[in-house]
Amino acid sequence: MKKLIERQNISENLNASNAYQQLGKLLNALEVKELPTETVDLINNEIEELNSISEIDKYFLKAIKEKENNVIKLIEKKHKIVPRNYYRKLWMILGMSAFGIPMGLVFGLSIGNFGMLGIGLPIGMAIGVGVGSSMDKKAFNQGRQLDFEVK
């Protein structure tokens, strides 16, 4: 797997520097996993595109995050390999929207006060965190979890 090139003046932009280091950690975590050559080639294409960017500006930061998301989506879809707390973060939002809002709506309608609509959000969030944490634990037990967390 290809490596990110060393950038001398990236330390001037703190956000870009942190994102670049995080992408490097993701690539290091992926090297431990045995990935097919097809997947490695796709990841290498993403890295080559990022290495070809010479200027460090706001578009560079956007490109780093885009490449990181592309790599995470690729390995999740093809191999079901996910970073730590991937499902917890995903299901927390799903729980709030799929369970929390309808529960709050029912609660608000039963009391007759739509101001209570927001009361379902923390309930849905708790349900989502519970479901996501159990899925993360299952992924860890099956060896499908990377030693890397998206921040």
Report residues per predicted region.
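Alpha-helical transmembrane segments and their membrane-interface exit regions
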Residues: 124-132
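Hydrophobic alpha-helical transmembrane segments
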Residues: 112-125
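Helix-termini ("caps") and immediately adjacent flexible loops/tails
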Residues: 1-101, 109-115, 133-151
